[in-house]
Swiss-Prot record:
Sequence ranges of the WD repeats: 12-50, 53-91, 188-230, 245-284, 292-330, 333-365
Keywords noted in UniProt: Chromatin regulator, Nucleus, Repeat, WD repeat
Protein's cellular compartments: Nucleus
Description of how the protein assembles with itself and partners: Component of the ASTRA chromatin remodeling machinery complex.
Keyword rRNA-binding: no
Pfam families reported in the protein's UniProt record: WD40 (PF00400)
Chief site of localization: nucleus
Annotated organism of origin: Schizosaccharomyces japonicus (strain yFS275 / FY16936)
Protein name: ASTRA-associated protein 1
Length: 365
């Protein structure tokens, strides 16, 4: 088993790093517990943008490009942000990066800080549930965005992603397509939704949800049907798979890219591989691996479907074989809990975000 060291550490945040997202052109987005977002240019390992995206902790980040990123915060907002290119290709000095966050905390901002922060503007936002720690899920291929239900944390709402391009709307509620998805009557009690993910295969969209009860549920719908408003979700989404595979709340669910599997982790010490069920005939029993490490709260699969990376409560990242689930490496650097992980598309570059406010970068396999 390999025990590597990080080749670089990013130190821009002043609070716990809670979410990470790569885009393919060497850009990394990071969000923290105070609602701050930073856009990093990894070609020079320097920040290009910083802004206060939310007034509370950031739950999720989805980078579309170096100019567009979605964020989900505990302040009841999902927002899309547009970033202006850095003036003259300039980057923000680390000292100024920290000063901006401190100035905002003290309600004082200098002219230089305001210039930097104003290079980012909000293109659209809508209100959502803040009673859960579950982040959103986005699928540009399906044109869908999924979040916990506005009122009931045990249910899910589906929104149109592309409809949110209308920045003149003032209702702040988004275009909700289906609402209150839940696995009843197959499962009566699931507890709150803990993690969600979306995947498109052929003309089907698969929505997987991990619940507080330890259940993992796969819903499936035709892409065309899911993109239309329907007040009865049962007419659009079908439960194809519902299994209680964890003894503790599910912390993360993630799809492989093209290997026909999805993976889940939990507050227990198991990682579970599930077959993607496009029909009830394709249902197979899940495969579990006891890792001996409870609380692997973020899973990510590399774009070649060969490795799986986790971020753990014990401050360690771990690399597993996506096929065998065997542990291949331990990423040991952080002094506190690792909250999030990300893998750059088409690369072996891994990022880990921690409660110690640092982001470690690794190149492995």
């Amino acid at each position: 088993m390999v025990v590597p060291t990080p080749f670089f550490v990013l130190r821009g945040h002043l609070s716990s790093v809670t979410s990470l997202s790569f885009v393919s052109d060497g850009i990394l987005y990071s969000g923290d517990a105070n609602g701050w977002m930073i856009c990093w240019d990894l070609s020079v390992m320097r920040p290009t943008h910083i802004w206060r995206a939310h007034t509370k902790s950031i739950l999720g980040v989805y980078g579309c490009s170096s100019e567009v990123v979605w964020t989900h915060g505990r302040d009841m907002q999902v927002a899309r942000w547009h970033l202006n290119p850095p003036t003259g290709g300039s980057h923000i000095p680390l000292s100024l990066l920290h000063a901006i966050q401190q100035e905002k905390k003290n309600d004082q901002q200098s002219s230089s800080s305001l210039t930097i922060v104003s290079s980012v503007h909000k293109g659209y936002f809508f209100q959502t549930n803040n009673l859960t720690f579950c982040s959103f899920a986005i699928s540009p291929a399906a044109g869908l965005l999924v979040v916990p239900n506005t009122v009931n944390a045990e249910q899910l709402d589906v929104y149109a992603l592309n409809d949110t391009s209308d920045s003149d709307r003032r209702d702040n509620c988004g275009k909700r397509l289906q609402h209150a998805l839940e696995p009843k009557p197959q499962i009566e009690k699931t507890g709150a939704v803990m993690s969600v993910a979306l995947h498109v295969k052929y003309n089907k969209v698969v929505l997987v949800a991990g619940y507080e009860s330890g259940h993992v549920v796969q819903y499936i719908a035709d892409v065309d049907a899911a993109q239309k408003v329907n007040v009865y979700f049962q007419q659009v989404w079908q439960v194809m798979y519902a299994e209680k595979v964890h003894k503790e709340p599910v912390l993360s669910v993630v799809f492989g890219n093209d290997n026909g599997y999805l993976y889940s982790s939990s507050a227990d010490d198991y990682i579970v591989r599930h077959t993607i069920c496009l029909s009830k005939e394709t249902h197979t029993n899940p495969e579990s691996m006891k890792t001996g490490h409870p609380g692997q709260q973020c899973l990510r699969v590399r774009s070649d479907d060969k490795i799986l990376v986790s971020a753990g409560w014990d401050g360690r990242g771990r690399v597993y074989g996506a096929k065998s689930l065997a542990k291949l490496a331990v990423l040991k650097y952080h002094s506190e809990t690792c909250n999030c992980a990300a893998i750059q598309p088409g690369s072996n570059l891994i990022a880990l975000g921690s409660k110690d406010s640092r982001i470690s970068l690794w190149q492995i396999y």
